[in-house]
Amino acid sequence: MARTASTILFLLCLVLITGYTMARQEHCNLPLEKGKCGGRFERFYYNSHKGKCESFFYGGCSGNDNNFENEEECDKACGAFMTMADANSFCNLPAVVGRCKGYFPRYFYNTEAGKCQRFIYGGCGGNRNNFETVXDCRATCHPREKRALADMTMADANSFCQLPAVVGRCRGRFPRYYYNTEAGKCQRFIYGGCXGNRNNFETVEDCRATCHPREKRALADMTMADANSFCQLPAVVGKCRGYFPRYYYNTEAGKCQQFIYGGCGGNRNNFETVEDCRATCHSHA
């Protein structure tokens, strides 16, 4: 009888502890909420992305339970409970703008792209796949990013290097690079900040490093006849509305001239420098 009572007591304690831990994790995962009032009261909240407590200014009313009067209270309530399994789960979540209408550049781990990318956060709500810096995003979801890159075969690279430039559903303006199969090289375009596809690179070097074999092969396979054909194409602004000075070979003028490129689409008679234009279409000049 005594043993049964002890077992029941132990199980009851276990249930209470588990419930407390889950409740703790719930409010420790909540985003920073300043509240609706206009006061300035220093408080602390648990930053689940960085795994530590940080200070913020509380307005004085409303907000949520991730709000502590001092750092010690925050540490005691939340501590460091995030496991790699937790990180893996929220790194899979989509970028969520949230219900507020602010404009805060943030980073999220994009499972489709296999890397951390920028998006615009509204300022409240959302989920844990939301980081203030790309470094924080990589530090948390880096094992996934590293593994995704390691698992990517040349066939994978070849497949997504053929995808078109996709602005995405958000309305930011972030200069990015994509491999343009028509032009046979990496070119700039304007990314909206969220969604899109893996043919999206922060630098032209990243684009070339990933899709370089295609770019190199395209250039190697390009005969003088190919050059002659696209050097005769007209300058095409493209469907995007960016402002990128480029050069094209003007058959009427018999030389390379500048034009304004919109950022995506267009054709292969499009060069970043006048030297590139002359080197490719030199026989016309």
UniProtKB/Swiss-Prot annotation:
Enumerate the spans annotated as BPTI/Kunitz inhibitor domain: 28-78, 91-141, 161-211, 231-281
Offer a single GO CC term for the protein.
extracellular space
Q: Supply the SMART domains for this chain.
A: KU
Q: Which N-terminal stretch is annotated as signal sequence? A: 1-23
| Location of the protein in the cell | Secreted; Nematocyst
Instruction: Return the InterPro entries for the record.
Output: Kunitz_BPTI, Kunitz_BPTI_sf, Prtase_inh_Kunz-CS, TFPI/VKTCI-like
- Spell out the residue numbers of the propeptide: 24-87, 146-225
What family is this? Belongs to the venom Kunitz-type family. Sea anemone type 2 potassium channel toxin subfamily.
Question: What name does this protein carry?
Answer: Actinia tenebrosa protease inhibitors
